[in-house]
Swiss-Prot record:
Biased composition (Basic residues): 1-13, 21-31
Classification via InterPro entries: Ribosomal_uL15 (IPR030878), Ribosomal_uL15/eL18 (IPR021131), Ribosomal_uL15/eL18_sf (IPR036227), Ribosomal_uL15_CS (IPR001196)
Quaternary structure note: Component of the large ribosomal subunit (LSU). Mature yeast ribosomes consist of a small (40S) and a large (60S) subunit. The 40S small subunit contains 1 molecule of ribosomal RNA (18S rRNA) and at least 33 different proteins. The large 60S subunit contains 3 rRNA molecules (25S, 5.8S and 5S rRNA) and at least 46 different proteins.
Organism listed in the record: Schizosaccharomyces pombe (strain 972 / ATCC 24843) (Fission yeast)
Name by which UniProt lists this protein: Large ribosomal subunit protein uL15A
Amino acid sequence: MPTHVSKTRKLRGHVSAGHGRIGKHRKHPGGRGKAGGLQHLRSHFDKYHPGYFGKVGMRRFHLMKNPLWRPTVNLDRLWTLLPNEARDKYLGKNTEVAPVINVLQSGYGKVLGKGRLPETPVIVQTRYVSRRAEEKIKQAGGVVELIA
């Protein structure tokens, strides 16, 4: 490439060669990284990163999740946790596949033994179960699975 058209040759005689008078092509003129986000780079941060600075809401220091949380459901309401189609499919029919009722997904933590179950095997997944409820489920041919 001929030297008489290169940029450095063109800029001979112009003191700062296109790099300005004060900074003179030195160091990090805007600061390093995200420096200046609240000062000289504020318009960029406001436009492209809204909500980057500041706090929102309150922090609850001593918040304890309830260790005794266990809403209960009785055996007589157990089959209502299944959708209608599944209930019609399994109740009263002699199938080899048993329905799985996950009590935790329905918002309950413990199964209690009030009421009667139909004589259809069922797999109950729960976190806690009473002794009578477990006996009645096993009498109906079902199984209780304890899940975390």
